[in-house]
C-alpha cells in the first residue's frame, strides 16, 4: 500500500511540474535592414538567422519594406546579410550583421541589421595596348632589311569586374595632357599640378564616346579598337587582329587621316562606331604610343562637353585647348610612364584618380594588363579548381621585369571556365603589370 501511495505521489508531482513549465513554441521574428540609423527598403534581399546554440540556420527574403520574417524557437541568434547592387557604372556591396538577437516567447521580437556600404567601379580597363610592335623587313633579294615599327594598332579592353550587368553607354575615353610623361608639363608648378584642387582633369585633343547602348555582362569584356579595326597581322604578323573588335573609334566626319583610321572590318556594325568632336588641331587622335595618361569617364552629353568653349582650358596653348573633365566622373585611369626616363617622368593624374604609375617598354608588342585580385577571385564559389596558377606571361628581366603578383594566369583561367576579379585600388603601380604578349594573340 505504501508503494502505491509513493507512486501516486510521484505521478502527481510530475503532473504539477509539467503544468508549471511553459510550452515552448516557435514565435514570429522580424529583422529589418537599416542604413545610417534609418530603415532601408530593399525587396528580395536574403537574410540569414543562425541559432548561436545549435548553429541551425534559417533563410528569408525581405519584403518591399526591407523586412524579413522568421518563425523560430526562443533563444540567441545572429542575423547576417550581404547583397550587391549596380548603378551608374558602380558596384555597391552591402554587408550587415547583428549578433545580439534574443528571441523571447512573449514580447515583440523585432530587430534590425545595420548595413555598411562599399563602392567599387563595375567597369575597369583590363588591358591597354598602345605601344605597337617591331617587325622584320625582308628585301626583294631575300636579304635582311632590318626592322621597322608599327603603332597604328592600339586597343583597350573594358571589363565588367562584378557579378551584375554593367551599363557602359555613357562611357567616354580620353587622355590627360601632356601627351607623354617625360615631356614638359605646363600644368606642373613647384612639383604640384595646378588642377589638383580644382576638381577637373585636362583632356587633350578629343574625347570619344559610344553611339549606342552598351551593356557588359558579368565578368565579361568588350574590345574597343582605338585605331583601325582590321586584321593588322595580315601585314604585320607581330601585331594584333582587331577585325573582331566589338567597337571601334571611327568617325569619318572628324576628318582624321586614313592611315590610322582605315575603314573598319565588316564584322563591326556601324552602330558600334564611336563618335568624337575634335577641339584641338591635328589629323588623328594624339594618344601617346609611349606613355599616355589614359582614362575612361562617364558623361551624359560628351558632344556638348567637347564643343562648348566654356569647358576649355588653354594652359597648353590657344591651338591646343583641353576639355575640363570632372574628377568625380572618372571611372578608371592608368598613368603610363616612359621606360628609361624616370629622371623626367612626371605624374599627370592626381592621387585621387591614380596614385601610381606603370612603365611601358613600347614597340615590342607588350601590353599593360590588370593584375588579378587573388583573394576575391578565389572566394568565388566553384572558382578555385578552375584557376590556373604559375603565371609566366609578364615581361622578362632583359626589359623591365614585371608580372602579376597573384600568380594566377587570368587568360588561361578564363578559358578554363573561371571568373576573374581584377584589382582596383586606383594605383597603377599595384593594379597593372606589363604583359609580354597581347591577350588577343
Annotate the PLM regions.
Residues 1-4, 19-20:
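Positively charged n-region of N-terminal signal peptides that target proteins for export
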Residues 5-9:
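Sec-dependent signal peptide hydrophobic core
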Amino acid at each position: 500500500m505504501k508503494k502505491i501511495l509513493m507512486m501516486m505521489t510521484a505521478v502527481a508531482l510530475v503532473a504539477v511540474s509539467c503544468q508549471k513549465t511553459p510550452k515552448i513554441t516557435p514565435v514570429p521574428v522580424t529583422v529589418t535592414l537599416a542604413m545610417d540609423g534609418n530603415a532601408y527598403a530593399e525587396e528580395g534581399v536574403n537574410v540569414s538567422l543562425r541559432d548561436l546554440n545549435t548553429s541551425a540556420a534559417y533563410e528569408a527574403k525581405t519584403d518591399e519594406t526591407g523586412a524579413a520574417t522568421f518563425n523560430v524557437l526562443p533563444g540567441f541568434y545572429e542575423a547576417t546579410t550581404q547583397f550587391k547592387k549596380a548603378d551608374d557604372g558602380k558596384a555597391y556591396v552591402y554587408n550587415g550583421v547583428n549578433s545580439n538577437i534574443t528571441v523571447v516567447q512573449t514580447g515583440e521580437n523585432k530587430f534590425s541589421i545595420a548595413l555598411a556600404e562599399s563602392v567599387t567601379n563595375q567597369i575597369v580597363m583590363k588591358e591597354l595596348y598602345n605601344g605597337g610592335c617591331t617587325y622584320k623587313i625582308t628585301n626583294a633579294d631575300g636579304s635582311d632589311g632590318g626592322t621597322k615599327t608599327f603603332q597604328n594598332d592600339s586597343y583597350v579592353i573594358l571589363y565588367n569586374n562584378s557579378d551584375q550587368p554593367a551599363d557602359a553607354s555613357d562611357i567616354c575615353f580620353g587622355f590627360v595632357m601632356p601627351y607623354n610623361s617625360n615631356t614638359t608639363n605646363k600644368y606642373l608648378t613647384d612639383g604640384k599640378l595646378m588642377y589638383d584642387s580644382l576638381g577637373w582633369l585636362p583632356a587633350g585633343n578629343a574625347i570619344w564616346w559610344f553611339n549606342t547602348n552598351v551593356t557588359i555582362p558579368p565578368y565579361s569584356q568588350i574590345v574597343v579598337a582605338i585605331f583601325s579595326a582590321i586584321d593588322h597581322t595580315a601585314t604585320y604578323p607581330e601585331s594584333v587582329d582587331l577585325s573582331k573588335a566589338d567597337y571601334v573609334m571611327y568617325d569619318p566626319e572628324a576628318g582624321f587621316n586614313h592611315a590610322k583610321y582605315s575603314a573598319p572590318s565588316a564584322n563591326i556594325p556601324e552602330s558600334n562606331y564611336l563618335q568624337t568632336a575634335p577641339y584641338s588641331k591635328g589629323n588623328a587622335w594624339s594618344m601617346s604610343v609611349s606613355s599616355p595618361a589614359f582614362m575612361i569617364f562617364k558623361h551624359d552629353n560628351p558632344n556638348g562637353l567637347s564643343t562648348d568653349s566654356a569647358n576649355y582650358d588653354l594652359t597648353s596653348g590657344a591651338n591646343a585647348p583641353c576639355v575640363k573633365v570632372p574628377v568625380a566622373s572618372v571611372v578608371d585611369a592608368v598613368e603610363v610612364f616612359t621606360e628609361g626616363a624616370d629622371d623626367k617622368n612626371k605624374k599627370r593624374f592626381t592621387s585621387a584618380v591614380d596614385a601610381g604609375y606603370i612603365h611601358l617598354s613600347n614597340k615590342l608588342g607588350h601590353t599593360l594588363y590588370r593584375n588579378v585580385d587573388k583573394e576575391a577571385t578565389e572566394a568565388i564559389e566553384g572558382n578555385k579548381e578552375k584557376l590556373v596558377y604559375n603565371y609566366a606571361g609578364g615581361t622578362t628581366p632583359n626589359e623591365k621585369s614585371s608580372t602579376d603578383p597573384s600568380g594566377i594566369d587570368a587568360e588561361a583561367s578564363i578559358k578554363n571556365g573561371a571568373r576573374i576579379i581584377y584589382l582596383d585600388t586606383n594605383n597603377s603601380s599595384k593594379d597593372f603589370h606589363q604583359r609580354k604578349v597581347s591577350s588577343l594573340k
